[in-house]
């Protein structure tokens, strides 16, 4: 009797709960902040221009959402929408990666260009989208940017460029690097014509883009906490054998050291650009 009592196994008393993860929540209805991890309604976040309600982190905007935020409704006309990259160096798997990003983003390349109006003032615009090849600069990006700059020069329009890039596109080699000089020459012609160029640096702006067209605006603006620099932090520290400040390569650090004119919160982006365009319009009358 006692032997049977001690050998008796206890019945487990628990309930099995079925995993219902995401079953009742439509895809895309919620977004998690990449910084503080707070989960928010995607629609409400979009209404706040993708700025986190909890930590104020500026989550990336798509190129078209950025243009929508700074332009009058229905005023944007896109240029060169169908232009796509070739594979000049026959780099393995390059075209496959391009096609994958095209399907993922709905873009042909990592920059959208065209003209728009802000409070009735016409301007040329280029917006880089870091979802596509991390916004890396290849031949198509250089060509599209040069074309819109040249259009602005010919039609005497101010030009606004939003940069977001990991640098030059390695799969295009020297062809990618030459876009640094090519875009700078177009901007020089625009400047010589007495026209305004506003460079708006967003997170991240690095490498060849930061060393060329992103840094030569008549007015250089940035979003808060944006990473802006040329080489990586670790590379610099190993080269100079020194420890860099914690806020090195942030927008605030560059503002403090005179490399930016202003750090602008995204909710103030439209108003700030409108005020600058109005000043330029008055001066050039």
Curated annotation (Swiss-Prot):
Compartment(s) of residence: Cytoplasm
Q: What is written in the cofactor note of this entry?
A: Binds 1 zinc ion per subunit.
Under the cellular component aspect of Gene Ontology, which terms does the record hold? Answer: acetyl-CoA carboxylase complex
What cofactor requirement does the entry state?
Answer: Zn(2+)
Q: What is its main location?
A: cytoplasm
Under the heading PROSITE patterns, the entry gives:
COA_CT_NTER
| Stored Gene3D superfamilies | 2-enoyl-CoA Hydratase, Chain A, domain 1
Which stretches of the protein fold into C4-type zinc fingers, per the record? 33-55
| Catalytic reactions of this protein | N(6)-carboxybiotinyl-L-lysyl-[protein] + acetyl-CoA = N(6)-biotinyl-L-lysyl-[protein] + malonyl-CoA
Domain of life, per UniProt, equals Bacteria
> According to the UniProt entry, what is the EC number of this protein?
2.1.3.15
EC top class, in one word?
transferase
Enumerate the residues binding Zn(2+). 33, 36, 52, 55
User: A Pfam family in this protein?
Assistant: Zn_ribbon_ACC
- Assigned protein family: Belongs to the AccD/PCCB family.
Q: What does this protein do?
A: Component of the acetyl coenzyme A carboxylase (ACC) complex. Biotin carboxylase (BC) catalyzes the carboxylation of biotin on its carrier protein (BCCP) and then the CO(2) group is transferred by the transcarboxylase to acetyl-CoA to form malonyl-CoA.
Assembly and partners?
A: Acetyl-CoA carboxylase is a heterohexamer composed of biotin carboxyl carrier protein (AccB), biotin carboxylase (AccC) and two subunits each of ACCase subunit alpha (AccA) and ACCase subunit beta (AccD).
Kindly give the PANTHER family that the UniProt entry links to this protein: ACETYL-COENZYME A CARBOXYLASE CARBOXYL TRANSFERASE SUBUNIT BETA, CHLOROPLASTIC
Q: What is this protein called?
A: Acetyl-coenzyme A carboxylase carboxyl transferase subunit beta
Q: Which organism is it from?
A: Staphylococcus aureus (strain Newman)
Highest lineage ranks of the organism? Bacteria, Bacillati, Bacillota, Bacilli, Bacillales
The gene name reads accD
């Amino acid at each position: 009797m006692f032997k049977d009592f001690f050998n008796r196994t206890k019945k487990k008393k628990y309930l099995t709960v079925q995993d219902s993860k995401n079953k009742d929540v439509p895809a895309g209805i919620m977004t998690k902040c990449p910084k503080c991890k707070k989960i928010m309604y995607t629609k409400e976040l979009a209404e706040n221009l993708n700025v986190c309600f909890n930590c104020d982190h500026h989550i990336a905007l798509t190129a078209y959402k950025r243009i929508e935020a700074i332009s009058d409704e229905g005023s944007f006309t896109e240029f060169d929408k169908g232009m796509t990259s070739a594979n000049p160096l026959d780099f393995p798997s390059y075209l496959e990666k391009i096609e994958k990003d095209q399907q993922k983003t709905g873009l042909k390349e990592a920059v959208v260009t065209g003209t728009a109006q802000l409070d009735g003032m016409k301007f040329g615009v280029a917006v880089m989208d870091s979802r596509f090849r991390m916004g890396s600069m290849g031949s198509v990006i250089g060509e599209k940017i040069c074309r819109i700059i040249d259009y602005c020069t010919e039609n005497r329009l101010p030009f606004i460029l939003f940069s977001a890039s990991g640098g030059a596109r390695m799969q295009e080699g020297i062809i990618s690097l030459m876009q640094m000089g090519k875009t700078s020459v177009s901007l020089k012609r625009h400047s010589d014509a007495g026209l305004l160029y506003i460079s708006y640096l967003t997170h991240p702006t690095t490498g060849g883009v930061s060393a060329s067209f992103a840094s030569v605006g008549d007015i250089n603006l940035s979003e808060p906490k944006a990473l802006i620099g040329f080489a990586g932090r670790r590379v610099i520290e190993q080269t100079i054998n020194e420890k860099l400040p914690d806020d090195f390569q942030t927008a605030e650090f560059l503002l403090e050291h005179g490399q930016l004119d202003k750090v602008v919160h995204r909710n103030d982006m439209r108003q700030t650009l409108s005020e600058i365009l109005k000043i330029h319009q008055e001066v050039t009358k």
